[in-house]
Amino acid sequence: MVKKALIVILILLPFVQLALLPLVNRIEPIMFGLPFFHFWLLLWIIVTPLCSFGIYQMQKKDGGLE
């Protein structure tokens, strides 16, 4: 049950961040030389494949990919 809940969370995370875009549409603060909005997008470009990889690994362990 916990694995299924974690899979659902990993599936929903990239979509939830899209709903948060209006809240992060700011120039300040500057993070790593980028406006916060660009940093947010870059962060999720990196996090989204990690979520997909996590889902893949959990399903692979359960034999759900056969």
Swiss-Prot record:
Listed GO CC annotations: plasma membrane
Compartments where found: Cell membrane
Keywords: Cell membrane, Membrane, Transmembrane, Transmembrane helix
TM region(s), chain numbering: 5-25, 30-50
InterPro entries found in the cross-reference section: DUF3311 (IPR021741)
Topological category with respect to the lipid bilayer: Multi-pass membrane protein
Name listed for the protein in its UniProt record: Uncharacterized membrane protein YoyD
Gene it is expressed from: yoyD
